Amino acid sequence: RFDRPLNVVFVASKRALNTYGDITAESAFSTATNQVRTLTGLVNQSKVWMRIEGVTPSATLVTVQMRAAVGGSDLTMANELQNRIALELTP
């Protein structure tokens, strides 16, 4: 969770994913209460899914999931992407 608006965190998430791999798709939609953006990509042949959800006008929740090419999750790289997003948000 980041105390920044959705658009700012979305741009930081794109930069973080581009640092380690490639973005393959992005989308935006609204739920009943929140605006949501998603990113999908590849990092070291692992699939990445990011959900960036504005929970309030000034707070955003980011969920990162990674699946390795052999099927297991890659928690280390998912955590590294979360940390990179935080670094991208640092002034």
Where are these regions (language model features)?
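Ser/Thr-rich, low-complexity intrinsically disordered terminal regions
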Residues: R1-P91
